Curated annotation (Swiss-Prot):
Protein name per UniProt: Outer capsid protein sigma-1
Primary role: Fiber-like molecule that attaches the virion to the host cell membrane by binding to the primary receptor F11R/JAM-A and to sialic acid containing proteins (coreceptor). The interaction of sigma-1 with F11R is required for NF-kB activation and apoptosis. Binding to both sialic acid and F11R is required to induce maximal levels of apoptosis.
The encoding gene: S1
TM helices/strands, residue ranges: none
PTM (free text): Undergoes dramatic conformational rearrangements during viral disassembly in the endocytic pathway.
Length: 455
């Protein structure tokens, strides 16, 4: 709104509110009419200005669009110029290549001129050689005429000889003759062969046939065969013997069998049906009553065909004089002992005496080698346990071992058990109980027991 119009409206409002419009009521209508006209004029002016602004905005937008089109056209022109510059560079390269090609073409033309000069020389040589060839052809023509005369003179002789061959030549042959590759051959079966230039009969080996004195002979054993009335027969001595043996066989021949006997017609074997639960054939081929042996359990066993106590079930005593070896954490030492060994039933008891050793670790092994040192009647295998190395340990016990460095020993409780037996060497495990600084160890007497093997 126009500022002057605004001030006029404010002034009128103040005047109206001051005396309820009484003083201004007379001139108000004319002034309001004037204000309405002024407002209408201002509205028309604002409308024209607004329309002018819209037209100006449209023209600005059109100008901006034209500017964008011009920018795009300039970019296209720059791109086209760049392409033209590239094409000009390529044309320059082609022109340079054409210059090089023209130079090479000039060199090749020079070479062609040199080659044409050489071709002229070769042409002259060819002309000379053609002249020589013409002279040689004339000589050959003369020789060919001479050869024609010779062939004509020989033709009559050849015709006469060919006629003679046609009259006398063999062109076909009857069986067993045949013509193959201008040769006449004869077909022979397996019974005939050629011996030199003669036809002979083929006689296979070991048939008794032989050709001798122009005839076919048959050879036979005169001790067993003879010829009677042109027939080959057995001699009486041979025939009578065979006849006698056949008669004896017929008399002893078993044609059938009665139960419990059975005759197998396919194998010609006579056997007997038996109840295998009560009868059996012994090692002598005799029929015996089957004896039922009871299932014996240890210590009862079959002893020499009878029932008795197992030989392993008894008390045996012996001695082992050998070396006890200790090893553990780099410590190794050996001592010799005399040990009593007792075998009672299925257990073996090894009584080790007290002995003095050297330094031991917190855990180590005692090894007893039974390969040597066992006194009769025990053998190395008698010490084999029922196990070799198992999770189950035997002979577990606690032993008090005195450790010292020359003074009074201090006893440590160690756990000892059977760990392994291999190839006659029994290994005992000793560990636990702690340790002190020492150089000597005092081992008590102890007994190691474990079940032994019966294999």
């Amino acid at each position: 709104m126009d500022p002057r119009l605004r001030e006029e409206v404010v002034r009128l409002i103040i005047a109206l509110t001051s005396d309820n419009g009484a003083s201004l009521s007379k001139g108000l209508e004319s002034r309001v009419s004037a204000l309405e006209k002024t407002s209408q004029i201002h509205s028309d002016t604002i409308l024209r200005i607004t329309q002018g602004l819209d037209d100006a905005n449209k023209r600005i937008i059109a100008l901006e669009q034209s500017r964008d089109d011009l920018v795009a056209s300039v970019s296209d022109a720059q791109l086209a110029i760049s392409r033209l510059e590239s094409s000009i560079g390529a044309l320059q390269t082609v022109v340079n290549g054409l210059d090089s090609s023209v130079t090479q073409l000039g060199a090749r033309v020079g070479q062609l001129e040199t080659g044409l000069a050489e071709l002229r020389v070769d042409h002259d040589n060819l002309v000379a050689r053609v002249d020589t060839a013409e002279r040689n052809i004339g000589s050959l023509t003369t020789e060919l005429s001479t050869l024609t005369l010779r062939v004509t003179s020989i033709q009559a002789d050849f015709e006469s000889r060919i006629s003679t061959l046609e009259r006398t030549a063999v062109t076909s042959a009857g069986a067993p003759l045949s013509i193959r590759n201008n040769r006449m051959t004869m077909g022979l079966n397996d019974g005939l062969t050629l011996s030199g230039n003669n036809l002979a009969i083929r006689l296979p080996g070991n048939t008794g046939l032989n050709i001798q004195n122009g005839g076919l002979q048959f050879r036979f054993n005169t001790d067993q065969f003879q010829i009677v009335n042109n027939n080959l027969t057995l001699k009486t001595t041979v025939f009578d013997s065979i006849n006698s043996r056949i008669g004896a066989t017929e008399q002893s021949y078993v044609a059938s069998a009665v139960t419990p006997l059975r005759l197998n017609s396919s194998t010609k074997v006579l056997d007997m049906l038996i109840d295998s639960s009560t009868l059996e054939i012994n090692s002598s081929g005799q029929l015996t009553v089957r004896s039922t042996s009871p299932n014996l359990r240890y210590p009862i066993a079959d002893v020499s065909g009878g029932i008795g106590m197992s030989p392993n079930y008894r008390f045996r005593q012996s001695m082992w004089i050998g070396i006890v070896s200790y090893s553990g954490s780099g410590l190794n030492w050996r001592v010799q002992v005399n040990s009593d060994i007792f075998i009672v039933d299925d257990y073996i008891h090894i009584c080790l005496p007290a002995f003095d050793g050297f330094s031991i670790a917190d855990g180590g092994d005692l090894s007893l080698n039974f390969v040597t040192g066992l006194l009769p009647p025990l053998l190395t295998g008698d010490t084999e346990p029922a196990f070799h190395n198992d999770v189950v340990t035997y002979g577990a016990q606690t032993v008090a071992i005195g450790l010292s460095s020359g003074g009074a020993p201090q006893y440590m409780s160690k756990n000892l058990w059977v760990e392994q037996w291999q190839d006659g060497v029994l290994r005992l495990r000793v560990e636990g109980g702690g340790s002190i600084t020492h150089s000597n160890s005092k081992w008590p007497a102890m007994t190691v027991s474990y079940p032994r093997s019966f294999t």
